[in-house]
Structures are given as structure tokens and as C-alpha cells.
Amino acid sequence: MLHPRARTMLLLSLPAVAIGIASSLILIMVMKIASVLQNLLWQRLPGTLGIAQDSPLWIIGVLTLTGIAVGLVIRFSQGHAGPDPACEPLIGAPVPPSALPGLIVALILGLAGGVSLGPEHPIMTVNIALAVAIGARLLPRVNRMEWTILASAGTIGALFGTPVAAALIFSQTLNGSNEVPLWDRLFAPLMAAAAGALTTGLFFHPHFSLPIAHYGQMEMTDILSGAIVAAIAIAAGMVAVWCLPRLHAMMHQMKNPVFVLGIGGLILGILGVIGGPVSLFKGLDEMQQMVANQAFSTSDYFLLAVIKLAALVVAAASGFRGGRIFPAVFVGVALGLMLHEHVPAVPAAITVSCAILGIVLVVTRDGWLSLFMAAVVVPNTTLLPLLCIVMLPAWLLLAGKPMMMVNRQKQQPPHDNV
């Protein structure tokens, strides 16, 4: 016979698995549709018209029209495509289901159009809203927070292709007590995360790891080098943190989201022309291309890091629906490669992983997620002790510093003004 604690954990197992599978399927559906539309916009259509896909006019035109299209969706769809991600954390309160169709359309347009944001925030919003709405009807005795946690865990597992990230993140939020141990609370979320990760793995495997030279034995000088790299990445990230609310306030002085996002798309197009096609989109596939291109120099990596960080700030400030983690990882990779090219004595594995750790820590202010992203992009167990040590001064640098979010009390998203 099972202990009552075990029966309690099993109670939510079936809903957790169902939510994990559904979270993954929603992500896969959105990414597949966005991929088809992206291929149409950036491959087939310019080929049919006899235009080079990296033509400055094409890049500027597509991104400007993408901004206008997303602005129209936000302006006229029911629920105005959900909350402005610039004003929200990754895991937020559930939104009304009526806002989800507009949010999904806005996300797909942004992903396909080359906007420098990832899918993580909108997908998280969609999955939480559906889990809470459906769960409240099927099992009304289960509170909304439980559904939110399960949907969040399932989405994280689906996004990263592993339940490890969910385990790390929720281990610091689901604090155990004398009555309910931590792993009792983690049981159902990990079931959801595992189901989400396994479902994603049936269709495609998220490819985060980069072909970077293996790092051998850790030395004391490597710790100092890693801490300096992380500090440089944090400094770059804090510039973006300073710029985001100010640019957001300036752009949203225009009350119509069509104008705001149209101008934002135009700026993104200009940045895309400067940085080239590799600086567009969410950044995961593009960072693979960046590492594979042996022709890039120190100045090229620096330019890509600056352009991508600027594009991230502009896209978020304009109100595009998307997340900031994936493009931040691209920035970290570009910074790390730049620093390695500048000081070849420091291994690329250290510069890239520590730069990712620093920039993701700025964006998420989540130590476990930052460690996870650094370790998964540069998969080397020898680096783990070094990353844990480097995290300490990095965390000290960011203690009490503002987060990469807009204070919603000072600045409302555009759809609240129409």
C-alpha cells in the first residue's frame, strides 16, 4: 500500500503528464507554422521575385511590415494579444483565454519575420492560461497556482528538451517545509517537465550545444578569467537594462501600437542590415552559424553582440511578443567568441560559457537557469565547478540592481491606451 504522501503526489500525475504533453505540442505547432512562414518570407518569396534574401531593402521591408502586422494584431484582436512581455516576468499570472489567438498570431509573425526575440514568454503565457482555464473546470478543487506551476514546468521542459532546467528553477521557488518535503512538491512539476521534454524529443531535438574546443583541467587563473568575462557580459547587459524602460517610455508616447511596432520593425530592419542575416531571428540557429563561420574576426563578433543586444532592446521596447532568453544567449556567445579572439590564451569554452552565464543572469536574474544555459551550450563537466565559482562574484555584482523589465506602473503597454 502506498503512503498517503505518495497518493497525494500521484493525484496530480496524470494531469501533469497531460499538461506537459499539451505544452510541448503547442510549442511544436507554433514553431512549425513559424518555420513555414519564415521559409516563405526569406527563401521562396525573394527567390520568386529575383531578390537576394540578404538585400538591405528586403530585410528592412520584411521587418517593417512584420512590425505593422503585429501592431494590427495587438490593436484589433480580442485581448490585444496579451500582456506586453517587457512588463512581465517569464512566469506570470494567467491571462484570459480570449487573448490567446491574438498572442499566438503575433508570436508567429515575429518569429517568422526575423524579430530578435524567442518564443519562451508567449508560449509560457499561452500554456499557463489554457492549463488554468481547463484545469479549473475539470478539477475545481485544485488551486490556480498548482496549474500555473505544472504548465510552467511542462513548457520549460518542452523549450529546453530536458526536465533538468525545470528541476533547477522550481527547486528555489517551491521551498519545502517540515510538513511537505521539497521533492514531494517537485514531483508533479517534474512529471510535467519530463512529459514536455519527451514529447518535444519525438519531433525535434533543441540543439543548444556548440562545437567548441574541449576544456581540459581547471586552473586558478581560469577562475579569474571567467569572473572577468562574466563581469564584462554583465556590464553589457546592464546597459540594455538601463536602455529598455527609457526606450519603452519614449516609443509608447505614441498611443497606437501599429505606429510603435512599425517604427520598431523599421529600426530592427536597419540593425539587421548592419549585422547581416545572422543577427536576425531568435538566435539559436544563428549562433550555430556564427560559430561555424571561421571568417569572423574580433570586430565582427563585437558588432554582432552589439547589434543583437540593441535589437533585443528595440524589439522588447516596441512591444513585440517574444522572450529575451534565447537572443541573450546569442549575445553571450558572440561576446565570448570576441573575447577569445582578443585573448586566445583564455579557452573559448571559458569565455563563451561565462559570457552566457553573465548575460542570462542579467536578463533572468535566475542563477540556476543561467548556470543551466551556460552548461548546455558548452557541455563540459570540467566547466561546472568553474561556473559555480564564477556565479558568486557575478551574483554580487547584480545584487540590488534593476531587472530587465519595464515598471508597469510607470509605463503601460500600448493596448491599454487604445
UniProtKB/Swiss-Prot annotation:
Membrane topology is: Multi-pass membrane protein
Segments spanning the bilayer are: 10-30, 54-74, 99-119, 120-140, 149-169, 186-206, 223-243, 258-278, 300-320, 322-342, 343-363, 371-391
The coiled-coil segments of this chain are none
Instruction: Specify whether Ion transport is a keyword of the entry.
Output: yes
Molecular-function GO terms, alphabetical? chloride transmembrane transporter activity; monoatomic ion channel activity
Keyword Transport belongs to the record: yes
Keywords for the protein's UniProt record, in alphabetical order: Cell membrane, Ion channel, Ion transport, Membrane, Transmembrane, Transmembrane helix, Transport
Q: Which domain of life is it from?
A: Bacteria
Q: Where's it mainly located?
A: membrane
What are the subcellular locations of this protein?
A: Cell membrane
Q: Which HAMAP family match?
A: CLC_YfeO
Cross-referenced NCBIfam families, in alphabetical order? PRK03655.1 (NF002971)
**Recorded family membership:** Belongs to the chloride channel (TC 2.A.49) family.
Protein name as it appears in the record: Putative ion-transport protein YfeO
Q: Which organism encodes this protein? A: Escherichia coli O1:K1 / APEC
Lineage here is: Bacteria, Pseudomonadati, Pseudomonadota, Gammaproteobacteria, Enterobacterales
Its encoding gene is what?
yfeO
